[in-house]
Curated annotation (Swiss-Prot):
Produces ATP from ADP in the presence of a proton gradient across the membrane. The catalytic sites are hosted primarily by the beta subunits. GO terms for cellular component: plasma membrane; proton-transporting ATP synthase complex. Signal peptide: none annotated. It comes from Brucella abortus (strain 2308). Residues 1-42 are annotated as: Disordered. This is ATP synthase subunit beta. GO terms for molecular function: ATP binding; ATP hydrolysis activity; proton-transporting ATP synthase activity, rotational mechanism. Belongs to the ATPase alpha/beta chains family. Keywords: ATP synthesis, ATP-binding, Cell inner membrane, Cell membrane, CF(1), Hydrogen ion transport, Ion transport, Membrane, Nucleotide-binding, Translocase, Transport. Residues 1-21, 28-42 have a biased composition (Low complexity). Its EC number is 7.1.2.2.
């Protein structure tokens, strides 16, 4: 942390010689400070829009702006600066003394100079909302970035909102069928719930979220909002074109489009990445308040936390555990509590959450666990076996796995599958040391079934067709339960393991077994 502080000190030291001339004017400032009454009477004026301040210091993404006495902008207000013909938005983060605010820039600060004018808009960052946003890509401040002209909507909404009141919230236990076997069977998603996809680098979070967009958003009649937070620009571009090709969106937006996209990718400054999730959520909240059932996808929530940590360090806050911001739980809670289902409409949210160094106890993923209804944990050890989606069947959890919600049969099959896999996991050390021959007959059977179940949990994805060459499969919940029930009961003990790998329903596994037998003969 000392390193980060050094440039700040040097910057301050360098700024001193430049400030020598105006230093004489310091006397009136002291007199102003000596008149607390004047400052207090000036406080109500603070909210007045249009106050003009001047930039006094620029350190990376942090910009200090000095305002006339009594015209200090409120915390979270947006300031506008004309940066060489480009509209730069700054968000007020701290009040320094009586007349200076410290702000976070929502875009690059190259080209800013001291003394430049900054105008207080008198309100937080406002983004366009409503059906006009469908089919369009916006950035954090609501500007279109898809080169399809301005977003023609009169309605705008502040990105900072309070969470719905307790009495407005609604809960109903209903499953959202995704067509992905491992998810629907072992950790089903709740309609109007919050779902987290946890995984390290390169285990398939984005592919899984894209598949969910494909399966759920296409079948779902309502609107979807996708917030790309600090992820690869290429993936955002691919998603945009994929949505147009599949008919979810029309080129350039307009009639027939069903998804709004809000992007703040890896190359953006931390201010934009820390706020873009809120901009996306604001668009989704507006649809919900109009009585819609909305799907809200976020890729990646970790980048929201990471950007918050960068901003926090720039603002000079003392870091907490592992260098994260001291307000980690507050930031996460303020956002997650807004993603909720009310009596007006619902938001079903799917969030990809990067797990640094595959450590689920890291404060960033650990903080988000508490807010979720279902967690899908992607495991590197399963991905290494070539089983995709690499969902860990024992680590993934869901509030919906309850016989009252999913029914007795589904519950019993899910628990049986997990107990077989758990037994296999316990036997793995013995197998590694002594080999299969030392196991009892019963354990040998358990291991054989567990290996088939493991393979049957894999499934070809529609969005991965271009890589794998095998067509995607959507499996009905009844077929999923039937297949795993038969596997646990031993109905398919005679089939080879390979027959269960990368197939949809159990019928396809039987077909594949016949093909394999024919090839072997």
């Amino acid at each position: 942390m000392a390193k980060a502080a050094t440039p700040k000190t040097t910057a301050a030291a360098e700024a001193k010689p430049a400030a020598k001339a105006p230093a004489k004017k310091a006397a009136p400032k002291t007199t102003a400070a000596a008149k607390p009454a004047a400052t207090k009477s000036g406080a109500p004026k603070a909210a007045a829009a249009g106050a003009i301040g001047h930039i006094t210091q620029v350190i990376g993404a942090v910009v200090d702006v000095k305002f006339p006495e009594g015209q200090l902008p409120l915390i979270l207000n947006a300031l506008e600066v004309d940066n060489q013909g480009h509209r730069l938005v700054l968000e007020v983060a701290q009040h320094l003394g009586e007349d200076t605010v410290r702000t976070i820039a929502m875009d690059a600060t190259e080209g800013l100079v001291r003394g430049q004018e900054a105008r207080d808009t008198g309100e937080p960052i406002m983004v366009p909302v409503g059906v006009e946003t469908l089919g369009r890509i916006m950035n954090v401040i609501g500007e279109p970035v898809d080169e399809a002209g301005p977003i023609k909507t009169k309605a705008t909404r502040a990105i900072h909102q309070n969470a719905p009141e307790y009495i407005e919230q609604s809960t109903e236990a209903e499953i959202l069928v995704t067509g992905i076997k491992v998810v629907d069977l072992l950790a089903p998603y709740a309609k109007g719930g919050k779902i987290g996809l946890f995984g390290g680098a390169g285990v398939g979070k984005t592919v899984l979220i894209m598949e969910l967009i494909n399966n759920v958003a296409k079948a779902h009649g309502g609107y979807s909002v996708f917030a790309g937070v600090g992820e690869r620009t290429r993936e955002g571009n691919d998603l945009y074109h994929e949505m147009i090709e599949s008919g979810v969106n029309k080129l350039g937006g307009g009639e027939g489009s069903k998804a709004a996209l809000v992007y703040g990718q890896m190359n953006e400054p931390p201010g934009a990445r820390a706020r873009v999730a809120l901009s996306g959520l604001t668009v989704a909240e507006n649809f919900r308040d109009q009585g819609q059932d909305v799907l809200f996808f976020v890729d990646n929530i970790f980048r929201f936390t990471q950007a918050g940590s960068e901003v926090s360090a720039l603002l000079g806050r003392i870091p907490s555990a592992v260098g994260y911001q001291p307000t980690l739980a507050t930031d996460m809670g303020a956002m997650q509590e807004r993603i909720t289902t009310t009596t007006k409409g619902s938001i079903t949210s799917v969030q990809a959450i990067y797990v640094p160094a595959d450590d689920l106890t890291d404060p960033a993923p650990a903080t988000s666990f508490a807010h979720l209804d279902a967690t899908t944990v992607l495991s590197r050890s399963i991905a290494e076996k070539g089983i995709y989606p690499a969902v860990d069947p024992l680590d993934s959890t869901s509030r919906m796995i309850d016989p009252k919600v999913v029914g007795e049969e589904h519950y019993a099959v899910a628990r049986q599958v997990q107990s077989i896999l758990q037994r296999y996991k316990a036997l793995q050390d013995i197998i590694a040391i002594l080999g299969m021959d030392e196991l009892s007959e019963e354990d040998k059977l358990t291991v054989a079934r567990a290996r088939k179940i493991e393979r049957f949990l894999s499934q070809p994805f529609f969005v991965a067709e271009v890589f794998t060459g095998s067509p995607g499969k959507l499996v009905d919940l009844a077929d999923t339960i039937k297949g795993f029930k038969g596997l646990c009961a031993g109905d398919y003990d005679h089939l080879p393991e390979a027959a269960f790998y990368m197939v949809g329903s159990i019928e396809e596994a039987l077909e594949k077994a016949k093909k394999l037998a024919a090839e072997a003969a």
